Amino acid sequence: ILGGQLANVHSREILRWDVAISAGRFAYVGPDASYCIGPETKVLRWSGYVIPGLCDGHMHVESSMLTPAEFARAVIPHGTTTMFTDPHEIANVMGLAGVKLMHDEGLMQPVNIFTQMPSCAPSAPGLETTGYEICAEDVAEAMQWPGIIGLGEMMNFPGVVNGDPQMLAEMAATARAGKTIGGHYASPDLGSAFHAYAAGGPADDHEGTCEADAVMRVRQGMRSMMRLGSAWYDVETQITAITEKGLDPRNFILCTDDCHSGTLVQDGHMNRVVRHAIACGCDPLVALQMATINTATHFGLERELGSIAPGRRADVIFTSDLRELPIERVIARGKTVALAGRITTECPHIDWPAAARNTVHMGVKKSATEFAIPAPDGGVEVANVSVIGVVENQAPT
């Protein structure tokens, strides 16, 4: 790749440097790659920006209603080359077998899909009817799979705070494997309960909704994950921790959490999140760091991906504008996988078994009257009804 303006996320610089790729990895990154050119070398001349492939630090494929292969096909043209997925929705239905199916299909893709073993399936025991309940033995088994990067979001934060034996056993199995424990602290209480949660093992958290949340997570040694998904708009309210309070941006990560397929088609994926962070006042190179090297470092993969540097996986984006991020070309593991917004590679599927299909069983057929709330007799003008409140652009859990 000759003549490009390289975004160096290690030094936070733009450098007029060349890039040489061999066997799917960066072989040379520097001012003159001409000596790397042989008779069979493919040369790409590009005067625009050359940036690392984007990473989604926390997300659930199932929210899109797509399989991992189809999700990859949707997001690759938007520049996403690495995803850290928590398949806790399929775990609710199929348990460990379902997680393994998602894990296996993820490993087949032309981009990097790492799986976090779900920790809390079901997420609300006793309040939902599920097909399976994840246990500590399941977590210990999954930690041996090649694509497992850690433990998925620890949603049972009261269990962590109060020393629930199952939650502690799941985190212990993850720690023994030397992998990352994902967090989910969905409470405004930043006092003793939060301190206990941070001490329990979770290394990150994406449930923050305001500047104080982001600041406290970083101060307690956690990575603050700021999300922009289809329903989550939590970047703007937290990014002031960087842009105004001046906290070290290397401890912040961008993610989506949940994206509907319509969002992917109409608005994009991680390129949308980076654009949004920049529009909220973040320096473009800082925003890129939060969607590349910061994420890789958090999961122990800094020497493997997340930057354009020698030895790393050759995941690259060509873009003509560092703020708007139009994605002109996407390279993953040294091969062009998307060009001008269209995918140019295959995203293979596993052979999904019959057990993974038609899994919704409603029992007795329901009628509309069963969902009606009858008004009390006797001319009462006021009745108490249990409802679910709505918070605009948030979904506190």
Predicted regions and their residues:
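Divalent metal-coordination and catalytic microenvironments
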Residues: G4, G24, S47, H58, ...
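Divalent-metal coordination cores built from histidine and acidic residues
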Residues: A69-T180, K245-L247
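Histidine/acidic residue-rich metal-binding segments in metalloenzymes
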Residues: Y132-E153, G159-M226, Y233-L254, V265-A279, ...
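Active-site mouth loops of central-metabolism enzymes
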Residues: C55-T67, S123-C135, A203, E207
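Active-site beta-loop-alpha junctions enriched in small/polar residues
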Residues: H60-E62, H88-I90, P118-S123, E153-F157, ...
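Active-site microenvironment of metallo-dependent hydrolases
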Residues: I1-A27, D32, I76-H78, V265-G281, ...
